[in-house]
Structures are given as structure tokens and as C-alpha cells.
């Protein structure tokens, strides 16, 4: 496959800005990133490159004092997917902050890096993620916080909606914690295929349905969901909040992440205004996770 290489210059450059840019660019087709001194280098398949979508994303960048410019060139031939598949990621451990839960520890790993030196107790849950790309493996703080929030809940018998599923890790986590059913969707076709693949690996494919599309899919959904999780950027969360409110059950739980700590007031105001009660705030670095309950 032929790729474009985009050199992003971020002013001022910070780890937060780099993380946000990689997350947002990933939603418009970018597959791989390398950090540089002044920003990021991103790689996208030439056939999937949508420059207008990228420009719109940059125009709505959440950090108001940050400027982003980029140069485009054709990348040298290189199998980026194969490189990631060979390298994979080291096992990740997520622990519940709440005592007395049935599962206290979640271990996320890939097939090439099996966990070692851990106790396989009933209170430990294992999830294997075969990520053909680096997104949604559990390495990011936002994914870890939502997984932690799920560990701290009683998921038995719940119906779950996973919005912007990526690799499917959140829906799979919910199902392995006892959820009855999960509907997941993602705008990226690769994510849809990868979620289905990971559901098979974790033996929950009979309970997980994956759709290709954006939040507008919820306009035709007839079921209601006890738990709605969304790990998406701030602007999409705000755009789709009314849809989340429509498909959640009374007393249902809404778990949101994918945004910066500074965005908490904006997100909270929007959600509270739609009939939700704030339950919990989690923070990891500069990232945040908010948990709400429908009234």
C-alpha cells in the first residue's frame, strides 16, 4: 500500500498536544505516528487520505492556544501494519480503585507479549487484543480509565453500547465482566473488522454486534442500553450527547473519556443539562474520564 507522510508542526509543542493530535488524526484515517521534537509525523494510506476532513479536525483542535501546520509528502514503501504487528505492546495492568469488587485487576496483552509473574486469581481478568494498528490497545490513559470504571461496576446482565469502539476493548471488557450484550460502532472500517476479530479471540463474538458508521446510527437503534461508553474526542462527544441520552435506560450509566481535563466543565454542563447526575471523575495525566447516571 502507498502512504502519505505528514509532518505536523505543533506550536507550542507539548505531550498533551501530541496525544490529542494523534487521537484526532486517527479518527480521520491516520494509522501510525512518530513523535518529533516539534510535533508529530503521521502516516495515512493515500487512498484514504481526506485532507478536507483533516483540516476540519485541526480547525476544531481543543487547545485554543495551539497552532498546527503540516507538510505532505509521499512516504517510502514500508509495511507499517506489519511493523506494529511484530512489535505489539507490553502487557498493561489496570486496577480497580474500589475494594470488594469481583474483578480487581485487568490485564490487557497481545499474542506476542504474554503476561508473566502475575497471579491468575479469580479477581484477575485477562483480555487479549490483536491490534493490527496501535490504536485502542489499552496503552492510552483514556482507555485505561474507562476500563477501570467498568471494573468498579456490577456488569452482570447489562446491555452495553460502545461508541467509537476502535479495537473493541471496552465492549469486550464489559462482556467478560458479565454484560449480556454489546452493540459497538466505529466510523473506521478497519476498527469494525478488528473489533470482530478480537471478539472471537476473547470468545464473546456471540454477544457483540459491530456496525460501521458514526453516531447517526443511533437514530435508528430501537434498543436501550444500561451502560454507554464513549472514548471519543470532545467535539464528537458534544455532538452526539443527545443521541446517547436517547438510547440509555433510566438510571443507566454513561462513561465518557477521550478529552482533556480542561474540557471537564464543558462536557459536564452539556451532560447535566440532558438529565444526568455526575457520579465520578477520574484523571490520568492531563486526560479525564467522567461517569454519569441518567435520572
Walk through the language-model features, giving the residues of each.
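Conserved SAM/SAH cofactor-binding pocket of Class I
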Residues: 133, 137-216
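A short helix-to-beta-strand connector/capping loop
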Residues: 65-69, 104, 123, 180, ...
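N-terminal auxiliary segments of SAM/dcSAM-dependent transferases
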Residues: 2-116
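Accessory recognition modules or surfaces
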Residues: 45-49, 53, 156-159, 244, ...
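Conserved beta-strand elements of the Class I
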Residues: 127-128, 161
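S-adenosylmethionine
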Residues: 116, 148, 187-295
Amino acid at each position: 500500500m502507498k502512504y502519505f507522510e505528514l509532518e505536523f508542526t505543533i506550536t507550542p509543542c507539548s505531550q498533551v498536544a501530541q496525544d490529542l493530535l494523534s487521537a484526532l488524526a486517527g479518527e480521520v484515517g491516520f494509522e501510525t505516528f512518530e513523535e518529533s521534537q516539534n510535533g508529530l509525523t503521521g502516516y495515512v494510506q493515500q487512498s484514504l487520505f481526506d485532507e478536507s476532513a483533516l483540516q476540519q479536525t485541526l480547525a476544531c483542535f481543543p487547545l485554543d492556544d495551539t497552532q498546527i501546520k503540516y507538510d505532505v509528502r509521499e512516504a517510502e514503501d514500508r509495511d507499517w501494519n506489519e511493523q506494529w504487528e511484530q512489535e505489539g505492546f507490553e502487557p498493561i495492568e489496570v486496577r480497580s480503585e474500589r475494594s470488594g469488587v469481583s474483578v480487581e485487576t485487568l490485564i490487557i496483552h497481545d499474542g506476542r507479549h504474554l503476561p508473566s509473574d502475575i497471579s491468575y486469581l479469580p479477581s484477575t481478568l485477562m483480555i487479549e487484543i490483536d491490534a493490527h494498528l496501535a490504536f485502542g490497545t489499552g496503552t492510552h490513559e483514556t482507555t485505561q480509565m474507562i476500563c477501570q470504571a467498568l471494573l468498579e461496576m456490577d456488569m452482570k446482565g447489562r446491555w452495553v453500547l460502545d461508541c467509537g469502539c476502535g479495537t473493541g476493548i471496552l465492549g469486550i471488557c464489559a462482556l467478560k465482566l458479565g454484560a449480556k450484550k454489546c452493540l459497538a460502532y466505529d466510523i473506521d472500517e478497519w476498527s469494525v473488522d478488528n473489533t470482530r476479530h478480537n471478539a472471537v479471540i476473547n470468545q464473546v463474538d456471540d454477544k457483540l454486534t459491530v456496525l460501521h458508521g458514526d453516531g447517526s446510527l443511533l437514530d435508528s437503534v430501537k434498543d436501550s442500553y444500561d451502560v454507554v461508553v464513549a472514548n471519543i474526542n470532545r467535539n464528537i462527544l458534544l455532538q452526539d450527547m443527545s443521541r446517547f441520552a436517547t438510547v440509555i435506560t433510566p438510571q443507566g450509566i454513561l462513561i465518557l473519556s477521550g478529552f482533556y481535563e480542561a474540557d471537564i466543565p464543558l462536557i459536564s454542563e452539556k451532560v447535566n443539562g440532558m438529565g444526568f447526575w455526575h457520579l465520578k471523575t477520574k484523571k490520568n495525566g492531563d486526560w479525564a474520564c467522567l461517569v454519569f447516571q441518567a435520572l
